């Protein structure tokens, strides 16, 4: 079975409970659409679990990108403003060389991936006017990292589709889309599927969501 999660944000306990709920095994595959750390109190526990699992695949999110840029520039301000302090504290307590290893790993992460008829991405995509004349490879190859990690404007618009592909995204908590903390669940809108249920935001009734691609079953912790 193939599963997708996003925006776990250091919520390690919920992450482990989700793996137990879906009976995740070595025969399954899990794709995490970025933002695995920051804000929550156990960010590197999740990351270390992913690093040790051949069948769990991380895509880059904007929080991974902020760490990457902070490492390169030495300017931590944007990363810290967005909750990077919880991650940095754990990095400091790791062995020498861990931060460099983490940087090299994150630097190489993909920011968009196609699984059958699903396009997996953290935030958004660029839809050119002629996109339906393109092959899937051409469409994916024209995507830019900043759009895929930050953009909220395109995915979900009724005019922005690519053939019969569904686009699965995180980044924008569903509470921000519905303007409600009630009935928090995955949103299907047009060709887009929003799976960030704001796990780290408990005051907003945040949940960790997981979508099984094989039958579209939804799971929540």
Language model features with spans:
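His/acidic metal-ligating clusters that form di-metal
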Residues: 97-176
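Active-site neighborhood of divalent metal-dependent phosphoester bond hydrolases
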Residues: 43-116, 144-152
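Divalent metal-coordination and catalytic microenvironments
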Residues: 7, 35, 50, 61-62, ...
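Active-site environment of divalent metal-dependent phosphoester hydrolases
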Residues: 9-13, 38-40, 64-68, 127-128, ...
């Amino acid at each position: 079975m193939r599963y997708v999660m996003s925006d776990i944000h250091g919520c390690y306990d919920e992450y482990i409970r989700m793996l137990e709920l879906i009976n995740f095994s070595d025969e399954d595959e899990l794709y995490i659409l970025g933002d695995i750390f920051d804000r929550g109190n156990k960010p590197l526990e999740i990351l270390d679990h992913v690093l040790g699992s051949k069948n769990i695949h991380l895509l880059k999110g904007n929080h991974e990108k902020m760490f990457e840029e902070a490492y390169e520039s030495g300017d931590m301000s944007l990363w810290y403003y967005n909750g990077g302090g919880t991650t940095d504290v754990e990095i400091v307590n790791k062995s020498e060389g861990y931060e460099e290893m983490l940087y090299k790993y994150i630097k190489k992460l993909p920011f968009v991936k196609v699984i059958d008829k699903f396009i997996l991405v953290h935030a958004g995509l660029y839809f050119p006017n002629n996109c339906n004349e393109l092959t899937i490879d051409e469409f994916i190859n024209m995507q830019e990292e900043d759009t895929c990690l930050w953009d909220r404007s395109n995915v979900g618009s009724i005019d922005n589709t690519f053939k019969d592909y569904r686009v699965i995204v995180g980044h924008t908590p569903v509470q921000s889309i519905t303007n409600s903390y009630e009935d928090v669940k995955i949103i299907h809108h047009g060709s887009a599927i929003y799976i960030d249920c704001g796990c780290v935001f408990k005051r907003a009734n945040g949940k960790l969501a997981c979508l099984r691609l094989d039958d579209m079953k939804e799971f929540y912790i």
